[in-house]
């Protein structure tokens, strides 16, 4: 019970994912119109976007439709219980994923202690994945698939499970991998004249599950689309599709190494299906950061299965473990990190959305990628967005990057020409990519360029609004307030996420470029005062500022 409460607490942070908002709006659209969002009703750039590569139209349709059931369920949770309902739905889905890891580990090892420890190990890996996205259903259904296959009871449920899964998220093909591993094990056992129990039911139900997963808006295109994802330049910009960093060793890599080592040690007793699953999901984890959560399921299960020591913990150790779990629950509750049944409004441009809504602005806008979903939720149908996290068009994304980073004419149209081409009369943007600290150069470029076309009409710590034609009664702000906004924005993120200080480094560089050396030194000092990777270049620059008295 204590481990279950701890898991729920760990997996219930506030809603902090920018993609959540477009999933929520899409779910509302599906529920209220009883139709799929095809063609795209939310972004004005989608319809006219030319295909950048063969197959992009199929990818676009897939991205618009493959999560429809999960999106409708998330919206239903929101409509029933607001943001607390969404947070608890996510926590329960992930806790069930971890609980199934514990159940399978317990069933295989026969040791209850191994079960709850495997569940907690899965939870430790799952914490960064506590995001309100449809792939939560893939995590749960993958775990359910293995649990059903392990018990060999109710194999007839597999086709129904895969039917639901294939309409919640395109990751249902990962279930095929699990089915294939168990079917291959059964086939080899049959060839060795040692047939496994329920082998006929296993093959029939697995075949039924694969066929049932084709009953969705895209049929069996998920694998084709995945291959197209890997060749997409746009996907290469998304951090979740990047290969995971392996130094210092992350927790998933340590668990994977421990599981692999244990299986090699016990190789004579390791099941064929386990070797296949370890290899398949280890490969997936090394290909993309987003896949590392699956190691959090399989590695603890395999560790519990093959560790040679089978005894339960001594009574004293059990009491110590219970005390540690209770202390963790108390710490999380008192620190305010557990059961945060709200949206992290500080991350989103709520003030900017209020401004646009109150002035009934309907002009086309250019917006930053991470704000597209929130603006879609707040402003549609009066306003449609330029871009959002659905990643629907390679060409639009290329133009977006040229505008955002204020590219010149080299290699294509410059930012001003592209804004004219798209008919954008409003710009809603933040000024940093906080993971890397990269400055979005468009805003400081507009502020420091002699021009009268764009007026700064709104700014707070979350967003800036520039307009060509401000509403009546709105007095433009001093464009140099962009730099004050950048300071406010970076300061807010440092308060909330002190482990991501690179915006301060980039802000120092921005001030150095306009010869504001006092401010450059101040922000470089702030960066160096926060946790950061070794950065001799920044340390040298700071010493030079100090020695020069700047």
Please provide the spans of the model-predicted regions.
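Short hydrophobic/aromatic helix or loop-helix immediately within or flanking a transmembrane segment
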Residues: 45-84, 88
């Amino acid at each position: 019970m204590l481990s279950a409460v701890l898991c729920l607490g760990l997996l219930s942070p506030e809603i902090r994912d920018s993609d959540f908002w477009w999933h929520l709006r899409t779910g509302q659209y599906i529920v209220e119109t009883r139709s799929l969002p095809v063609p795209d009703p939310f972004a004005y750039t989608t319809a006219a976007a030319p295909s950048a590569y063969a197959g992009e139209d199929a990818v676009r349709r897939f991205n618009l439709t493959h999560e429809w059931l999960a999106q409708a369920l998330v919206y239903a949770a929101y409509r029933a219980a607001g943001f607390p309902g969404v947070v608890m739905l996510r926590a329960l889905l992930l806790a069930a994923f971890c609980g199934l890891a514990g159940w399978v580990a317990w069933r295989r090892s026969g040791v209850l202690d191994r079960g709850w420890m495997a569940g907690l190990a899965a939870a430790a890996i799952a914490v960064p994945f506590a995001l309100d996205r449809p792939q939560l259903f893939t995590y749960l259904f993958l775990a359910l698939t293995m649990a059903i296959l392990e018990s060999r009871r109710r194999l007839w449920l597999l086709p129904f499970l895969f039917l639901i899964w294939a309409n919640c998220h395109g990751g249902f093909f990962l279930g095929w991998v699990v089915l294939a591993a168990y079917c291959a094990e059964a086939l080899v056992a049959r060839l060795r004249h040692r047939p496994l129990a329920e082998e006929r039911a296993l093959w029939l139900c697995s075949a039924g599950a694969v066929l049932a997963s084709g009953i969705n808006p895209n049929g069996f295109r998920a694998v084709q689309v995945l291959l197209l994802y890997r060749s997409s330049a746009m996907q290469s910009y998304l951090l979740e599709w990047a290969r995971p960093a392996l130094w210092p060793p992350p927790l998933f890599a340590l668990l994977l190494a421990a599981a692999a080592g244990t299986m090699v040690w016990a190789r004579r007793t390791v099941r064929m299906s386990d070797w296949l699953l370890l290899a398949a999901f280890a490969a997936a984890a090394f290909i993309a950061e987003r896949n590392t959560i699956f190691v959090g399921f399989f590695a603890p299960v395999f560790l519990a299965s093959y560790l040679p020591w089978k005894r339960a913990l001594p009574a004293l150790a059990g009491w110590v473990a219970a005390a540690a779990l209770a202390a963790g629950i108390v710490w999380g509750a008192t620190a305010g990190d557990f059961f945060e049944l709200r949206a992290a409004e500080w991350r989103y441009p709520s003030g900017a959305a209020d401004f646009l809504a109150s002035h009934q602005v309907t002009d086309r806008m250019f917006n930053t990628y991470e704000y597209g979903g929130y603006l879609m939720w707040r402003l549609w149908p009066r306003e449609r967005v330029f871009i959002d996290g659905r990643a629907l068009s390679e060409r639009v994304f290329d133009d977006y990057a040229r505008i955002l980073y204020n590219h010149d004419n080299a290699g294509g149209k410059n930012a001003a020409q592209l804004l004219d081409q798209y008919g954008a009369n409003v710009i809603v943007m933040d000024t940093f990519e906080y993971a890397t600290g990269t400055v979005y150069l468009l805003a400081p470029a507009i502020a420091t360029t002699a021009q009268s076309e764009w007026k700064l009409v709104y700014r707070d710590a979350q967003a800036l609004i520039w307009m060509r034609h401000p509403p009546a009664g709105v007095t433009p702000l001093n464009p140099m307030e962009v730099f004050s906004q950048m300071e406010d924005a970076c300061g807010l993120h440092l308060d909330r996420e002190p482990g991501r200080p690179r915006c301060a480094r980039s802000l120092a560089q921005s001030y150095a470029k306009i010869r504001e050396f006092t401010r450059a030194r101040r922000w470089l000092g702030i960066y160096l005062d926060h946790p950061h990777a070794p950065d001799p270049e920044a340390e040298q620059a700071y010493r030079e500022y100090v020695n020069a008295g700047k």
